[in-house]
Amino acid sequence: MNDIAHDARPFVTDIKTLRARARQHIERGAVTAGYSADRDTVVKLLNEALATELVCVLRYKRHFFMAQGINAQSVAAEFQEHAAAEQVHADQIAGRIVQLNGEPDFSPDGLLTRSHAEYAEGDSLVDMIKEDLVAERIAIDSYREMIDYLGNRDPTSRRLMEDILAVEEAHADDLVQLLHDIDA
């Protein structure tokens, strides 16, 4: 006898049922009957992530332009690279919100209250790096919580946030290395 346990349920719903369900609520696009997450909650969480990314873009841009001192050129280049990556993340998140039939909230009103990260300017190059590192660490923790919440209910949003999380972790490592390089 085969050691693999067999499930009595069919692997997929019969094709006739799949086709019929696909025609229902066609205006919802990618949000099908099989979508099991609370769409409104997911859109709210994604808008918070969007605000976080936008605040990070703004902070990194300021730090890029304000970086001064002996190590400023290499650190500013890192700030610029991170700002560009955060902008890509913002665009990806906004695209997913639209795919879920939501509206991405780009309004400056309340941007800081929606964002998990703060907008801190920093007085010196080291302060700027530390503020960016704190913001990355906040994003890492909040995105991990979002990923846990999404679980299998919204695997597409979960994978998006997992990909973004990996970049945020790399950014945190970059910033720690910059601090070590400056101290050396």
Language-model features and meaning:
Residues M1-A184:
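Iron-associated oxidoreductase/ferritin-like identity signal
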